[in-house]
Curated annotation (Swiss-Prot):
It comes from Neisseria meningitidis. Belongs to the CMP-NeuNAc synthase family. This is N-acylneuraminate cytidylyltransferase. Coiled coil: none annotated. Keywords: Cytoplasm, Nucleotidyltransferase, Transferase. Its EC number is 2.7.7.43.
Length: 228
């Protein structure tokens, strides 16, 4: 098969925290719809695939004019990994070369412009990963890990706990919005983080991840403010 740039959107129908989360609407458009629109407007992809286990999600995806792959129940459970869902989608459509980008519907403030900018960091020759991230709200070196029997140890040095944050190295966390990989490398390594990994930095606001009703309200408020 010729090289293609594939977007895969994993959208389970059932969600324990927020029922039918991926179909919940924000300014009249479902979370799934916001992500599909971002993928389309980015103009980065030859094909956009929604992988789901539910008919309602499949119908919504088709309303936006994208392809649907039905995922078996064992790949759509609470414990199933995202990588297994992406590889299943690639195998189903017969894609094994080019690029694959995971876009999650729970990141509705990620735009087409974000995707284009992240794509510009991807190097086809090096074939590492590009992962979206945002600055850490709390620095990881200022934390303690429980090791055993109520004992705790610092992430690195006890002295880090008393250092001004500005004197510590910058820290970022993946925000779940964008994962870009060479398709063959992702299949071979069975993971999203492949060295060398480049980070595409997004703001805290644009990095909001929808897990609760409050998250949804906050995201809608941010979107309304952007559009006002």
């Amino acid at each position: 098969m010729e090289k293609q740039n594939i977007a895969v959107i994993l959208a389970r129908q059932n969600s324990k925290g927020l029922p039918l989360k991926n179909l919940r609407k924000m300014n009249g458009i479902s979370l799934l719809g916001h992500t599909i629109n971002a993928a389309i407007s980015s103009k980065c992809f030859d094909r956009i695939i929604v992988s789901t286990d539910g008919g309602l999600i499949a119908e919504e995806a088709k309303n936006f004019g994208v392809e649907v792959v039905l995922r078996p129940a064992e790949l759509a459970s609470d414990t199933a990994s995202s990588i297994s869902g992406v590889i299943h989608a690639l195998e189903t459509i017969g894609s094994n070369s080019g690029t694959v980008t995971l876009l999650q519907p729970t990141s509705p403030l990620r735009t087409g412009a974000h995707i284009r900018e992240a794509f510009s960091l991807f190097d086809e020759k090096i074939k590492g990963s590009v992962v979206s991230a945002c600055p850490m709200e709390h620095h990881p070196l200022k934390t303690l890990l429980q090791i055993n029997n109520g004992e705790y140890a610092p992430m690195r040095h006890l002295s880090d706990l008393e250092q001004p944050r500005q004197q510590l190295p910058q820290a970022f966390r993946p925000n779940g919005a964008i994962y870009i990989n060479d398709t063959a490398s992702l299949i071979a390594n069975n993971c999203f983080f492949i060295a060398p990994t480049k980070l595409y930095i997004m703001s805290h606001q644009d990095s909001i991840d929808i897990d609760t009703e409050l998250d949804l309200q906050q995201a809608e408020n941010i979107l309304n403010h952007k559009e006002s």
